Swiss-Prot record:
EC number: 7.3.2.2
Keywords: ATP-binding, Cell inner membrane, Cell membrane, Membrane, Nucleotide-binding, Phosphonate transport, Translocase, Transport
PROSITE patterns according to UniProt: ABC_TRANSPORTER_1, ABC_TRANSPORTER_2, PHNC
GO cellular component terms, semicolon-separated: plasma membrane
Lineage: Bacteria, Pseudomonadati, Pseudomonadota, Betaproteobacteria, Burkholderiales
Domain ABC transporter residue range list: 5-253
Gene: phnC2
Binding partners and assembly: The complex is composed of two ATP-binding proteins (PhnC), two transmembrane proteins (PhnE) and a solute-binding protein (PhnD).
UniProt membrane topology term: Peripheral membrane protein
Similarity field: Belongs to the ABC transporter superfamily. Phosphonates importer (TC 3.A.1.9.1) family.
Keyword Translocase listed: yes
Subcellular localization: Cell inner membrane
Name the record gives this protein: Phosphonates import ATP-binding protein PhnC 2
Organism this protein belongs to: Cupriavidus necator (strain ATCC 17699 / DSM 428 / KCTC 22496 / NCIMB 10442 / H16 / Stanier 337) (Ralstonia eutropha)
Gene Ontology molecular function terms on file: ABC-type phosphonate transporter activity; ATP binding; ATP hydrolysis activity
Top-rank EC class of the record's enzyme: translocase
Length: 284
């Protein structure tokens, strides 16, 4: 089977004495929704940026494929990385919209990878492309704001506009980097529900970084947990308990729990054995 995302033995060092990513391997199937869980500084954003081809890993250390095509290998970007990036939608924590431009123009940026270069430079869009952008905004519930400046939208609305951009891009993979970190609870719920809806209806693979365990358990059937750049857990979100998280993270578990999950272990005696669980307590 061709995986939507495949990471093999990826390492990244920003300093000689510390690895931001340490021999990370993971596979995500088409149509899967996976939470990338970890405390601040665990390597979540760094991993997502590697998958998107924004940065490269250490020389001679690993490879990344999206839909069977290389993004990077042994610390070098693939020659066709621009085409592969066209299949990847990226949702940033700070929305990455141009505030002075209309919302619809920000959304239509998602089409630029597949239009002639002169049109992408001049940002000239055809009528059917504009209609596609309006349809995408309708799907995320903010089509009434299409011709307003992006800066006039609330944080939650801006994040939904960013998700609409991935829809017009027709991305088969969505990477979302802490998409709810700066949002209020209701906006957070809407954004996560929207990502789940896109995952289910479009069969898009979604990898979303989070630091809230309760959100990961509510929206993502599978969790990949990082600590100090290492994968310390890969398995069903339903199998995670506060006790297990404290075993994996120690005092860092408090940042993940945030009193949002009852501080008690769920008995595993009655819980069916997870189909796939990888734990690395040595890395923790």
């Amino acid at each position: 089977m061709t995986h939507a995302i495949e990471v093999r033995g990826l390492s990244k060092s920003f300093r000689a004495d510390r690895k931001a990513l340490d021999d990370v391997t993971l596979h995500i199937a088409p149509g899967e929704m996976v939470a990338l869980l970890g405390a601040s500084g665990s390597g979540k954003s760094t991993l997502l940026r590697h998958v998107a081809g924004f940065i490269t890993g250490d020389a001679g250390a690993g490879e990344i494929l999206v839909n069977g095509r290389h993004v990077q290998r042994n610390g070098r970007l693939a020659r066709n990385v621009r085409k592969v990036r066209g299949e990847i939608g990226f949702v940033f924590q700070q929305f990455n919209l141009v505030g002075r431009l209309p919302v619809i123009t920000n959304v239509l940026v998602g089409t630029l990878a597949r239009v002639p270069k002169w049109r992408s430079l001049l940002r000239i869009f055809k009528a059917d492309e504009v209609q596609g952008g309006l349809d995408a905004l309708a799907q995320v519930g903010i089509d009434d704001y299409a011709f307003q400046r992006a800066s006039t939208l609330s944080g939650g609305q801006q994040q939904r506009a960013a998700i609409a951009r991935t829809l017009v891009q027709n991305a088969s993979v969505i990477l979302a980097d802490e998409p709810i970190a700066s949002l209020d609870p209701e906006s957070s719920r809407r954004v996560m529900s929207l990502l789940r809806q896109i995952n289910r209806t479009r069969k898009v693979a979604v990898l979303v970084s989070l630091h809230q365990v309760d959100v990961a358990m509510r929206y993502c059937p599978r969790v990949v947990a990082l600590r100090h750049g290492k994968v310390v857990y890969d398995g069903p979100s339903a199998a995670l308990t506060p006790g297990m998280l404290r075993d994996l993270y120690g005092t860092e578990a408090d940042e993940l729990l945030l009193d949002s999950v009852p501080d008690e272990d769920v008995s595993t005696a009655a819980m069916p054995a997870p189909a796939m669980v990888t734990m690395n307590l040595a890395a923790a």
